[in-house]
């Protein structure tokens, strides 16, 4: 028979319990990826490249292709950035999926992780498919 103090000292199998929910988080991330690609498809089908729609006085939706990172950082770097940013997007997604597997973070953090995974992989799809992010 094990004493209460010995039972308390034994590590709990966190990964096994987290891996059950991990699939749920990955389904949500895949849904975010599908939503990302769906919205980009709607924009590409209905808004000519370079055109914009005023949503409010201070917010416009503009159809652009960004070969760089955020705010066109590295957009004119000569093409190597496409591959580097693709690898970075996949790497970040793998790290965040690993954190979800381990059960790291609060539920709010996990929702943020799946949003980041969905968006990062959406950008990876764009870079592989058309060489830039819509």
Task: Describe the predicted segments one by one.
Residues 1-134:
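Alpha-helical transmembrane bundles and membrane-interface segments of multipass inner-membrane proteins
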């Amino acid at each position: 028979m094990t004493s209460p103090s010995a039972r308390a000292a034994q590590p709990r199998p966190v990964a096994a319990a987290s891996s059950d929910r991990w699939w749920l988080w990955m389904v949500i991330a895949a849904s975010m990826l599908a939503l990302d690609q769906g919205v980009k498809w709607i924009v590409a089908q209905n808004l000519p490249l370079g055109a914009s729609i005023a949503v409010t006085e201070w917010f416009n939706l503009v159809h652009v292709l960004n070969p760089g990172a955020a705010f066109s950082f590295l957009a004119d770097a000569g093409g190597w950035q496409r591959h580097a940013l693709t690898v970075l997007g996949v790497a970040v997604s793998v790290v965040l999926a690993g954190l979800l597997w381990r059960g790291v973070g609060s539920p709010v953090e996990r929702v943020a992780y799946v949003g980041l995974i969905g968006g990062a992989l959406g950008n990876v799809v764009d870079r592989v498919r058309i060489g830039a992010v819509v």
